[in-house]
């Protein structure tokens, strides 16, 4: 079995992680976008990749099924973080977590009146903390996709979601009215593995760190 297992998710994060892997001399043997394999070997016999759902990356690393992983800050905030070390902000998959409403919704007035808003999101923990810090009372509705639909069918007054260009919001007559925080992908490491496999993991951390864009 390879010494190092790295958990990744398909899509943008995987594509943005490729330069970091190359910097460490790691080349995947298969393209996860075209391969059905969930365990992908590399040109290095001591390193393999496991392809999992983005929301599951921290869990695989936490329980030692993977030694390292790359996960968005949004995912990590919803995870308890036990047993995880987060040494690097890779500055990839960058976006913003925002509060958004319909174009015709007077959010400022609703907040001023102390209205109890319904907010749809898959980031329940983060949203709860955000609104609590503002002294707002909200009812959170957990959704797993198509957040933009919720205000359009009166399921929710607002949504909390990730926004990159804002084009999806605009196409659905929504507007972002409040930024909660900037989001990017982080390198995470199993704390036990960092101690037990330090001679193998530390060089990876150093090469990943050197590959992080310095002008962002």
From Swiss-Prot:
SUPFAM superfamilies the record matches: Periplasmic binding protein-like II
One Pfam family hit: HisG
Reaction it catalyzes: 1-(5-phospho-beta-D-ribosyl)-ATP + diphosphate = 5-phospho-alpha-D-ribose 1-diphosphate + ATP
Keywords: Amino-acid biosynthesis, ATP-binding, Cytoplasm, Glycosyltransferase, Histidine biosynthesis, Nucleotide-binding, Transferase
Segment forming the signal sequence: none
Catalytic EC class: transferase
GO biological process: L-histidine biosynthetic process
GO cellular component, one term: cytoplasm
Broad class of the protein's primary localization: cytoplasm
Source organism, top-level taxon: Bacteria
One function term, GO molecular function aspect: ATP phosphoribosyltransferase activity
SUBUNIT field: Heteromultimer composed of HisG and HisZ subunits.
NCBIfam families from the UniProt entry: hisG
Physiological role: Catalyzes the condensation of ATP and 5-phosphoribose 1-diphosphate to form N'-(5'-phosphoribosyl)-ATP (PR-ATP). Has a crucial role in the pathway because the rate of histidine biosynthesis seems to be controlled primarily by regulation of HisG enzymatic activity.
Name of the molecule in the record: ATP phosphoribosyltransferase
Species the sequence originates in: Nitrosomonas europaea (strain ATCC 19718 / CIP 103999 / KCTC 2705 / NBRC 14298)
Gene from which this protein is expressed: hisG
């Amino acid at each position: 079995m390879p010494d190092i297992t790295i958990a990744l998710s398909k899509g943008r994060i995987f594509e943005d992680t490729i330069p970091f892997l190359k910097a460490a001399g790691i080349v995947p043997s298969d393209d996860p976008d075209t391969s059905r394999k969930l365990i992908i070997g590399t040109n290095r016999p001591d390193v393999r990749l496991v392809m999992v759902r983005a929301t599951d990356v921290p869990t695989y690393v936490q329980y030692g099924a993977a030694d390292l992983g790359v996960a968005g800050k949004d995912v990590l905030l919803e995870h308890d973080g036990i047993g995880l070390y987060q040494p690097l902000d890779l500055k990839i998959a960058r976006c913003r977590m925002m509060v958004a409403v319909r174009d015709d919704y007077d959010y400022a007035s609703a907040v001023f009146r102390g209205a109890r808003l319904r907010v749809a999101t898959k980031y329940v923990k983060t949203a709860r903390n955000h609104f609590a810090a503002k002294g707002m009372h909200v009812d959170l509705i957990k959704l797993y996709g198509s957040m933009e639909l919720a205000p359009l069918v009166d399921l929710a007054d607002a949504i909390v979601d990730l926004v990159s260009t804002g084009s999806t919001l605009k196409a659905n007559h929504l507007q972002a009215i409040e930024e909660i925080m900037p989001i990017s992908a982080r390198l995470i490491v199993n704390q036990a593995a960092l101690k037990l496999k330090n001679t193998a993991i530390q060089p990876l951390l150093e090469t990943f760190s050197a590959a992080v864009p310095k002008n962002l």
